[in-house]
Amino acid sequence: MKRREAIQLFTAAAATTAIGGRVFAQSQKLRVLILGGTGFLGPHFVEALQAGGHQLTLFNRGKSNPGLFNNLETLIGDRDGKLDALKGREWDVVIDDSGYVPRQVQLTADLLKDHIRHYIFVSSISVYGTFPKPGLNEDDKVATPPDAKVEEVTGETYAGLKAGCEQVIESTYGARSTIVRPHYVVGPGDSTDRFTYWVVRVARGGQVLAPGSANDPLKYIDVRDLAAFMRRCAEQRPAGRFNACTPPGAHT
């Protein structure tokens, strides 16, 4: 995907947030399947897609925040082979918010291949390595997927497993796929406190012991902006990979 096209998508997504979604008033109403949907990112994806009038179905284990969306169709299953609830159904777009292990992603991808129009996979900026350099673009080298027997998600395996999941989706769907690589996602519902801690601590004043220097670039994306972009991807179905983060620069 050319950078100009990516900027156009991000600009339109930002406009959605700014004007309450009215920019998409004339867009086609889609049947969207969200794999996951009840963690940190998912509820924001649901809100953004509902604002566009799209018909949503969730597929998850029913363990995280059960009953959060009683007004939505929720199919209960498991990515590790318990996919019967998805059989015989069709959707326009799938948003994969719960893919971490290539083998499991392959199972879902194969099952849905002939029953959907487009697959959007939520990956991570971590595929580039632990400390990505400034100015990365979507064609830069990513981590090497681990041996197929490695399925435990840890700090050491996360990047490679996510990169392996990307390979599965791109090889299965080709131009019918979108890979979104968010940087650190922040905003309402984030339980990690990995970003907000520093903002609050600095606001309190006094000396702060912190890693790095004040000149280090800082990259993140507000979960609501990410959700608006995901909606745009669902509606436009662009092929390719996208880094989802703030514009370049340092924050002080």
Label every model-predicted segment.
Residues 172-218:
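NAD(P)-dependent short-chain dehydrogenase/reductase
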Residues 200-208, 216-250:
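Alpha-helical substrate-binding/gating segment
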Residues 89-146, 164-166:
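NAD(P)-cofactor binding segment of oxidoreductase domains
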Residues 149-179:
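Active-site Tyr-X1-5-Lys
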Residues 76-91:
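Conserved Rossmann-fold cofactor-binding substructure of NAD(P)-dependent oxidoreductases
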Residues 59-63:
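N-terminal Rossmann-fold cofactor-binding loop
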Residues 3-25:
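N-terminal export signals
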Residues 35-52:
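N-terminal Rossmann NAD(P)H-binding glycine-rich loop of SDR-like oxidoreductase domains
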